[in-house]
Amino acid sequence: MRVVVTGGSGFIGRHAVAALQARGDEVVVADLKPFPSPSVDCRVGDLRDPGFVERAVAPGTDAVVHLAAITSVLLSAKDPHAVFQTNVDATELLLERCRALGVERFVFASTNAVAGDVGAVTIDEAVLPHPLTPYGATKAAAEMLFSAYAASYHMATVALRFTNVYGAGMQTKDSVVARLMRCALGGGAIQIYGDGEQRRDYVYVTDTVAAIEIGLGLGRPETLTIGAGRSVSMNELWQTACEVTGVAIPADHVAAKPGEMPAVVVDTSRACTLGYAPAYDLAAGLAATWEDFVANGGGRAP
């Protein structure tokens, strides 16, 4: 297949490009940044520009994997309009381009944040979207577009609701796993909110890529929850990071954020019935991430 990967120069994107090329797909990257390797066909531009979308998604394209997005919850709260333009308007331009060319397969990186605060309820695909942040709202809005394009134009739109993605190559990310790795590598303390018993699901990056490959092969509309299938507390994440790095990472306990959810528990069974099988548990995933940080440096958050 000829697959266009938007955001292909990013964290998940680089892994997706490598996996798709390894299985024999012809890959075109569309990104604001050049791809690290000149051997990859990378079109540099802004997906909010209709002209660039036409150049990136050219005739002969078989599928689009749409990973490009602004994913910062903080930025979405500061400038929701800019995030809406990138996460929703650009998505609609891509869908329209696919409709014009007859490209039916469209896989999208969504988020479990579309569900919002569900209390003690386990999050699965049946939970109605009730996002609490502008970022979550943009992903939910994109999912509504997919539903409409699937019903109206018979497009095989697949929304993958990722949990917290981590892994090799995340040096510039400002997520808790990346911060833990930087603390272990260069010193400094990790901030832990409240008692540290808030629980989250952390999924290794190559497991999300496996889900992308499943999505490309479905040939029908679908929404899937993609995670490790096991939620861990911040304390367990911190302690496991200390164990795999061999560093006693100091922790600063600070007041909990207002409105922070005590637990995010997801059910990945629907994806598992389609062949999804996470290969990394937390210790193995953190060990692989640490190995990459040691080999390539800690980088810094943007």
Predicted regions and their residues:
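N-terminal Rossmann NAD(P)H-binding glycine-rich loop of SDR-like oxidoreductase domains
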Residues: 3-22
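Conserved glycine-rich Rossmann-like NAD(P)H-binding loop of the short-chain dehydrogenase/reductase
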Residues: 25-36
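Conserved Rossmann-fold cofactor-binding substructure of NAD(P)-dependent oxidoreductases
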Residues: 41-63
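Conserved NAD(P)H cofactor-binding loop of Rossmann-fold oxidoreductase domains
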Residues: 68-71, 110-111
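Catalytic helix-loop patch of NAD(P)-dependent Rossmann-fold dehydrogenases
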Residues: 78-93, 100, 105, 114-159, ...
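C-terminal substrate-binding subdomain of Rossmann-fold SDR/epimerase-dehydratase oxidoreductases
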Residues: 184-302
